[in-house]
């Protein structure tokens, strides 16, 4: 009986406490009601202040700056770094290789080629993320002398978008994205496309990619595109407004340098990589004979040009 009475007393006290809290809150509400507008303005000001503080803290964390911003589309970046990759590598005691890239009205499409795992996709994602950060009003990890513009539209095609529900293959999904990009492309659009034309038979895939690339060029769209296709590299050399870029590779150490060099197409280093991982030499010889000496020699000459350019620079 005593336990029951004690429990009832506790419940009564808890209910009394809740009633008292409600009374206090009502009283406070009555006191502040005449100042509601001032309080809302103060709340908004504090939110803005916190946003500024968060931006400063974020900028310090990623090494971000407020670059020179132009009222027209332009990408003229030095020391650009992917912020997430930068933080991840710093934890491992490593450093990001900075990206230098320039696109303007005269040179508005960049075709990046080079070996797999050489940094092509990282370059693409770095451009996309930094540009989006800027347009969200955030500091960006680039050199202080970098110049950045504003794009009205950004479109991205990266990764495998195969859909079971929509019955779309990887290539079909890729083509659907290309179709939408052709519709939206204009001189204030930035397109980011990874492995352009991939996912299908190389001959028709490369031809389709070249035909679509011609439309982007005609519409003066800005674009950063990665590819292995030779015809797209030739397209860049033959058309104004389009430029090749190569991901550099150390042929002696057989490792990627993760540096983008604009002006020359890159090699896929297929023969060198196959030899490095131990593919039998007779298999490599057969592959070389099948593809033709001219193709292999052209790839070798391309490597020599890139090497010589690096030496003289």
Where do the protein language model's features map onto the residues?
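A structural signal for well-ordered alpha-helices, especially hydrophobic packing surfaces
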Residues: 14, 50-53, 79, 182
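Short amphipathic alpha-helical coiled-coil/interface segments
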Residues: 10-13, 46, 313
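Switch/coupling subdomain of P-loop NTPase systems
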Residues: 1-37, 95-97, 106
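ATPase nucleotide-binding head domains, primarily ABC-like/P-loop NTPase cores
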Residues: 62-63, 70-311
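Hydrophobic face of alpha-helices
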Residues: 7, 25, 46, 124-125, ...
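Charged, surface-exposed helical/loop "interaction arms" that form contiguous linear patches used
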Residues: 16-70
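Residue-level signal for secondary-structure boundary sites
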Residues: 4, 57, 83-85
């Amino acid at each position: 009986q005593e336990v029951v009475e004690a429990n009832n007393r506790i419940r009564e006290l808890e209910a009394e406490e809740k009633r008292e809290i409600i009374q206090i809150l009502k009283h406070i509400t009555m006191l502040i009601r005449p100042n509601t507008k001032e309080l809302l303005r103060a709340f908004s000001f504090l939110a803005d202040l916190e946003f500024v503080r968060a931006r400063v803290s974020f900028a310090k964390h990623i090494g971000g700056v407020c670059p020179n911003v132009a009222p027209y589309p332009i990408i003229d970046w030095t020391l650009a770094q992917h912020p997430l990759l930068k933080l991840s590598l710093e934890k491992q005691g490593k450093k990001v290789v900075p990206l230098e890239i320039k696109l303007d009205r005269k040179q508005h499409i960049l075709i990046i080629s080079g070996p797999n795992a050489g940094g092509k996709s990282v370059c693409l994602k770095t451009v996309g993320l930094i540009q989006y950060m800027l347009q969200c009003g955030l500091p960006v990890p680039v050199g202080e002398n970098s110049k950045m513009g504003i794009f009205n539209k950004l479109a991205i095609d990266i990764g495998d978008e195969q859909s079971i529900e929509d019955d779309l293959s990887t290539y079909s999904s890729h083509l659907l994205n290309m179709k939408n990009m052709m519709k939206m492309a204009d001189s204030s659009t930035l397109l980011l496309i990874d492995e352009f034309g991939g996912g299908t038979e190389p001959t028709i895939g490369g031809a389709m990619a070249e035909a679509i690339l011609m439309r982007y060029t005609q519409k003066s769209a800005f674009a950063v595109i990665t590819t292995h296709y030779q015809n797209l590299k030739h397209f860049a050399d033959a058309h104004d407004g389009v430029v090749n870029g190569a991901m550099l590779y150390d042929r002696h150490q057989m490792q990627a340098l993760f540096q983008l060099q604009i002006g020359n197409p890159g090699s896929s280093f297929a023969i060198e990589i196959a030899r490095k991982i131990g593919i039998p030499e007779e298999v490599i010889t057969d592959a070389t004979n099948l593809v033709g000496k001219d193709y292999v020699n052209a790839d070798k000459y391309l490597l020599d040009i890139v090497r010589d350019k690096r030496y003289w620079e």
